[in-house]
Amino acid sequence: MTLPTAHRLSEATTTTWPARTTHQEAGWEIRDGAGGGKRVSAVTLAQKDLADIEWIEATLTTLGQEHLFMIRDGDEILDAALAARGYEIIDPVILYLCETARLRPASLPRAQSYCIWEPLHIMREIWAAGGIHEPRIALMHRVQTPKTALLARSGDTPAGVGFLALDGEIAMLHAVEVLPSFRRRGVAKKLMAQAAKWAEDHGALYMALMTTRDNTAANRLYSSLGMRPVGQYHYRIKDPA
């Protein structure tokens, strides 16, 4: 089975975690993230050759946006140019991928995980505790493909949440959050199992997700489940002042 390419995963990410608006101009793709975080707010290069950095800096300043760039595989020239202009690396990210069938368990623990749309109030509270607030909930509502929110319990207590959406053969998992007092109790594994069941039931051959390189616990979990790192990206940022 041929795995999706890095470009295909980027398409799936855009579909399942969309900016409010995007447009291309002067060799750049410019996003309005509406407060939804770096991934939907960062500028990316939209051509092979290096575009005019001074132009995009001036444009971002006019728009009142951060000078924030996403650097993907193949963007090495842009990365070096931004470094020379004083932009610092922030939040290196690893992309993980796995065949859905490999993640789906034979059965799920009874009454320990659920697929729910729209998110319940308690789910919003768990997300908020992890810094995922209303702009990102609004982002989830913007997704136009099949989607669901995930809830997992620890015993009888709601303890973890996630968001899953489909783009063709790929189900992308986003916004995984487990309350600190319930970590290392298997809650994230329950979320992953429920996500895999939903994904396979909806025809997804693959499940993908991303996490920061510094999130040791998440990287350990995804590797232990048989997910493979298949790509990476990072951001470069500079105070527009």
Task: Describe each model-derived feature in a short phrase.
Residues 138-179:
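A conserved beta-strand-loop-helix scaffold within acyl/acetyltransferase catalytic domains
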Residues 83-90, 223-232:
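Conserved acetyl-CoA-binding loop of GNAT-fold acetyltransferases
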Residues 1-62:
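N-terminal charged segments
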Residues 70-77, 209-219, 236-240:
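Conserved beta-strand-loop-alpha-helix junction that forms the acyl-donor binding cleft
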Residues 36-43, 90, 165-174, 183:
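A conserved beta-turn-beta hairpin within the catalytic core of GNAT-like acetyltransferases
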Residues 1-12, 42-46, 93, 101-136:
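Short amphipathic alpha-helix that is part of the acyltransferase structural core
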Residues 50-57, 178, 184-197, 201, ...:
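Conserved acetyl-CoA-binding loop-helix of GNAT-fold acetyltransferases
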Residues 63-73, 199-210:
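Conserved GNAT acetyl-CoA-binding A-motif
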